[in-house]
From Swiss-Prot, chain A:
Alphabetized UniProt keyword annotations: cAMP, cAMP-binding, Nucleotide-binding, Phosphoprotein, Repeat
Modified residues (Phosphoserine): S104
GO cellular component, one term: nucleus
Assembly notes: Tetramer, composed of 2 regulatory (R) and 2 catalytic (C) subunits. In the presence of cAMP it dissociates into 2 active monomeric C subunits and an R dimer.
GO molecular function: cAMP binding; cAMP-dependent protein kinase inhibitor activity; protein kinase A catalytic subunit binding
Name recorded for this polypeptide: cAMP-dependent protein kinase regulatory subunit
Motif Pseudophosphorylation motif: where in chain: 101-105
Cystines in this chain: none
Coiled coil: none
A Gene Ontology biological process term: negative regulation of adenylate cyclase-activating glucose-activated G protein-coupled receptor signaling pathway
InterPro entries per the UniProt record, alphabetical: cAMP-dep_PK_reg_su-like, cAMP_dep_PK_reg_su, cAMP_dep_PK_reg_su_I/II_a/b, cNMP-bd_CS, cNMP-bd_dom, cNMP-bd_dom_sf, RmlC-like_jellyroll
Origin species: Schizosaccharomyces pombe (strain 972 / ATCC 24843)
Region (Dimerization and phosphorylation): 1-142
Disordered: annotated segments: 392-412
From Swiss-Prot, chain B:
Pfam family membership, one: Pkinase
Catalytic activity reported: L-seryl-[protein] + ATP = O-phospho-L-seryl-[protein] + ADP + H(+); L-threonyl-[protein] + ATP = O-phospho-L-threonyl-[protein] + ADP + H(+)
Segments of skewed composition (Low complexity): 16-27
Ligand binding (ATP): L207, G208, T209, G210, S211, F212, G213, R214, V215, K230
Known regulation of activity: Activated by cAMP.
Any one GO CC term of the record: fungal-type vacuole
Organism, scientific name: Schizosaccharomyces pombe (strain 972 / ATCC 24843) (Fission yeast)
Keywords, alphabetical: ATP-binding, cAMP, Kinase, Nucleotide-binding, Phosphoprotein, Serine/threonine-protein kinase, Transferase
Protein name (record): cAMP-dependent protein kinase catalytic subunit
Length: 412, 512
């Protein structure tokens, strides 16, 4: 490339971009040119490149390239002396992005193994109609999405009814601690917000709620962030009508129910997995990885989980309910219940399912598949394959490769 | 004839590959010199500071034992016992030459002891004979395959094979390195309590504030060196039900020892407050640098990410989750290397999973938000957010409304800016992976999936760990002068430090 060509190119760029710092612009331009040319040159001897284990000189030269790298060219970046080798680069921040330091958040520390020992708190059951209505209210909220039927009811039963007789009562005040989540049963509430950051509730109460934002009607909820952690309330909610009824749920009760159940389920998984002979070559840590990976699936009565003759790669544990094992020509050979498992050989071998498993009642299963197993534990499969017990599993009493009953001791 | 010719060519190649290894080996003595120099600063802190208090001696002794104790493979045992036994065995098995550098300095810094060992081991990641024979056989296979082919094609094939073998060697080297760094831990009876008192320090300006207190720059009245003291208000901790987190923070920081993790020198308390004496990282927060630069070029982000990854790997292998990764908690030391600070949410997770929601909203993993018990995989998610934020200048999930933010995280849709390289996008898509059974760091190879990812191909991990790599940015500070120019100014408030009337909660915080 001749000098004239380089000059022409640079001139065209300068004319086009009209940089404020011309010297810096030229510097970046030549740096870029040089780097491009060198990289072409380097490509010639890739063999030595592949041998270098991130050669230091390479790394350094590339660090130097950062100063005048392709990313730092022209209008994309600005030279700031205090930044040393670094530069101020162009970024299009998301709208309203807060560039300030971010505060950590935390719930109260909780130890589920401790409260598993305590007696479970029970709440008086609510009217089924009320439950249905409450459930509909929170259906779209992600905090409630992972709850299954019985835990859902448990959480909703833990909600307490509150009556607010008059209009103009503040249920939550901006800046105050957030401990409760509310669902409106009857009446309407207005939401107001002060624009100031970090305003105290005292200031809000003494000098006004601020700008009107929206109105909350029956069936809607507010204050849901309080279920996650204690953050200052972002707005105030004030009753608009007289004779209001709301349901309140506090964070501690909510999280306790959720994690108590999660903990019980986890303990159940771990104990069930311990009973599966084929997994006995795994250590505790590996079994925990599987317990982490188990997915809950629910089958309605009558639906088929696996079908004889299909090729399967999933393993199932029965968490709740009953399942019937049906063999072609033989009818129901056995009924499996909570704590039983089936399909475990699919984890090691490509197996053809030798029987059909059908849900007899509503059936809650925990399942994971062979690809997941491979990803998480890899060659642990080889260990399992060489186990005599794994081979034994193939000749169990039903003469079935993919069905197995756990010892009676696991049945709770 | 043909075969032998190529085979001999192969063997010269083996020669050159062992050369590569020995070159790096020959680099190490100088590296040692460097690292001793670098750490001599810390040695001075350790030996001279706070006169007459043998602060570092105990930790050095056991450190050597741990890094030498090859029998100490069981991670959990690090937390329980076996330290004296390991020490005994280590003294037996110590090679005399590995002690040279440690004895010259009298009380060698913990770091140089550890890395001396690493250096001794690195040159032979594979048993000498094994590495030779395996590479040779691969070349022989080659020669058979390659017979009759054109020279150029042959060359390409050979380089592809070499590339594979090279990757394997690199992987073995890196895993050996990680293995060593993971075993460095201070003994369980390492006490931090009452080693210092408020009278030992002159409290200077505030470096940062948090929910329970603030961090001060302080000067030691004994050795005149500068430190940072984190002051926590006991009543606030109790009110906000963070007792367990605070006690865990002290315990974990008193046990960990890693180049990229802040050092806890000691703790003490007065009637109302807890005090934690730590290193003063003079370069300020990575957060401030990032906001000034707006975003980092890939090379810079990669450098900081690499240091964070080594620290996380170390913590995880010692059964600790960190849980609050973000640029605000990464400080730069005077050389421009990272120090992870604020272990307020760190937790030991040997057996159980975590279920306390904690962290920083932008960095929370989906499993934490959706109220599932979670584990170390959540830290790797946060690493993904951190890398994204360094490259883009802003985090991948953002909303002013926290509930909307959490919905975005659960949805998991990431928009990668056009200037992200394909390799970085590939890595991030494996870290910002909602399904923890697919998330890098949590799979069968653990952190190796991240460390060996192509995005880090030009990172030399042993040089990162020994801090023998040129940093992308050296903080413009006057080292050792208590220069806090890299920190934001905070309004100073009247403090009640040192009061002894009505001591509160002393039984709860008895270890401070």
């Amino acid at each position: 490339m001749s000098f004239e060509e380089v000059y022409e190119e640079l001139k065209a760029l300068v004319d086009e971009q009209n940089p404020s710092d011309v010297l810096q612009f030229c510097y970046d331009f030549f740096g870029e040119k040089l780097k491009a040319e060198r990289s072409v040159f380097r490509r010639g001897d890739t063999i030595t490149e592949s041998f270098s284990d991130g050669d230091e000189s390479d790394f350094l030269s590339e660090l130097n390239d950062m100063v005048a790298g392709p990313e730092a060219i022209g209008p994309d970046a600005k030279y700031v002396p205090e930044l040393g080798g670094l530069k101020e680069m162009n970024v299009s921040y998301p709208q309203n992005y807060n560039l300030l330091r971010r505060q950590s958040v935390s719930t109260e520390s909780m130890n589920p193994s401790a409260f598993a020992l305590e007696t479970k708190r029970t709440f008086p059951p609510k009217d089924p109609e009320d439950l249905k209505r409450l459930k509909r209210s929170v259906a779209g909220n992600f905090l409630f999405k992972n709850l299954d039927e019985e835990h859902y009811n448990e959480v909703l039963n833990a909600m307490t009814e509150k009556r607010i007789g008059e209009a103009g009562v503040a249920v939550i005040v901006q800046g105050a601690v957030g401990d409760y989540f509310y669902i409106v049963e009857q009446g309407e509430f207005d939401v107001y917000k002060r624009p100031e950051l970090n305003i105290t509730p005292e200031e809000v109460l003494s000098s006004g709620y601020g700008n009107y934002i929206t109105t909350i009607s029956p069936g809607e909820y507010f204050g849901e962030l309080a279920l996650m952690y204690n953050a200052p309330r972002a707005a105030s909610v004030v009753s608009k009508t007289p004779n209001n009824v709301i349901y309140a749920l506090d964070r501690t009760s909510f999280r306790r129910i959720v994690f108590e159940n999660a903990y019980r389920q986890r303990m159940l998984y771990e104990s069930l997995l311990e009973e599966v002979p084929i997994l006995s070559s795994l250590d505790k840590y590996q079994r925990q990885k599987i317990a982490d990976a188990l997915q809950t699936v629910v089958y309605q009565a009558g639906s088929i989980v696996i079908r004889q003759g299909d090729i399967g790669n999933q393993f199932y544990l029965i968490e709740d309910g009953e399942a019937e094992v049906v063999k072609n020509g033989k009818g129901v050979v056995v009924t499996l219940t909570k704590g039983d498992y089936f399909g475990e050989l699919a984890l090691i071998h490509e197996t053809v399912r030798n029987a059909t498993v059908q849900a007899k009642t509503r059936l809650k299963l925990a399942t994971f598949d062979k690809p997941t197993f491979n990803r998480l534990l890899g060659n642990a499969i080889d260990l399992m394959r060489n186990q005599p017990r794994a081979r034994m599993g193939m000749d169990n009493e039903y003469g079935d490769q993919s069905l197995h009953r756990s010892p009676p001791s696991t049945k709770a | 004839m043909d075969t032998t010719a190529v085979a001999s060519k192969g063997s010269t190649n083996v020669g050159s590959s062992t050369d590569t290894l020995s070159t790096s080996a020959s680099l190490h003595p100088s590296m040692n010199a460097g690292s001793v120099n670098e750490y001599s600063e810390q040695q001075r802190h350790g030996t001279n500071s706070f006169n007459g208090k043998p602060s570092v001696h105990d930790s050095v002794g056991s450190d050597a034992s741990v890094s030498n104790g090859h029998n100490n493979h069981n991670e959990s045992s690090l937390w329980t016992s076996g330290i004296p036994k390991a020490l005994e065995e280590a003294t037996k098995s110590k090679k005399p030459d590995s002690l040279v550098s440690t004895s010259t300095s009298g009380c060698a810094s913990a770091h140089s002891v550890g890395y001396q060992n690493i250096d001794n081991l690195i040159p032979s990641p594979l048993p000498e004979s094994a590495s030779r024979s395996s590479s040779q056989s691969s070349h022989q296979r080659h020669s058979r395959d390659g017979r009759g082919e054109l020279g150029s094609e042959h060359g390409e094939r050979r380089s592809a094979m070499d590339g594979l073998r090279d990757r394997h060697i690199r992987k073995v080297r890196v895993s050996q390195l990680l293995d060593l760094q993971r075993r460095r831990i201070r003994p369980a009876d390492h006490t931090t309590k009452d080693r210092y008192g408020i009278q030992d320090f002159n409290f200077l300006q505030t470096l940062g504030t948090g929910s329970f207190g603030r961090v001060h720059l302080v000067q030691s009245n004994h050795n005149r060196l500068y430190y940072a003291i984190k002051v926590l208000e006991k009543k606030k901790i109790v009110d906000m039900k963070q007792i367990e987190h605070t006690c865990d923070e002290r315990y974990i920081l008193s046990r960990v020892q890693h180049p990229f993790i802040t050092i806890l020198w000691g703790t003490f308390q007065d009637a109302k407050n807890l005090f934690m004496v730590m290193d003063f990282a003079e370069g300020g927060e990575l957060f401030s640098l990032l906001r000034k630069c707006h975003r980092f070029p890939e090379k810079v982000a990669k450098f900081y990410a690499a240091e964070v990854i080594l620290a996380l790997d170390y913590l995880h292998h010692n059964q600790i989750v960190y849980r609050d990764l973000k640029p605000e908690n990464l400080l730069l030391d005077r050389f421009g290397h990272l120090k992870i600070v604020d272990f307020g949410f760190a937790k030991r997770v040997s057996t159980s999973n975590c279920c306390t929601l904690c962290g920083t909203p932008d960095y929370l993993a989906p499993e934490i938000i959706s109220l599932k018990p979670y584990n170390k995989a959540a830290d790797w998610w946060s690493l993904g957010i951190l890398i994204f934020e360094m490259l883009a200048g802003y985090p991948p999930f953002y909303s002013e409304n926290p509930m909307k933010l959490y919905e975005n995280i659960l949805e998991g849709k990431v928009n990668y800016p056009s200037y992200f390289s394909p390799a970085s996008i590939d890595l991030l898509s494996h870290l910002l992976q909602r399904d923890i059974t697919c998330r890098y760091g949590n799979l069968k190879d653990g952190s190796m999936d991240i460390i060996m990812h192509p995005w880090f191909r030009d990172i030399s991990w042993d040089k990162i760990l020994t801090r023998k790599i040129e940093v992308p940015y050296v903080p413009p500070i006057q080292a050792g002068m208590g220069d806090s120019s890299q920190f934001d100014a905070y309004a100073d408030v009247a403090t009640d430090y040192g009061t002894s009337e009505d001591p509160e909660f002393t039984s709860i915080f008895k270890d401070f």
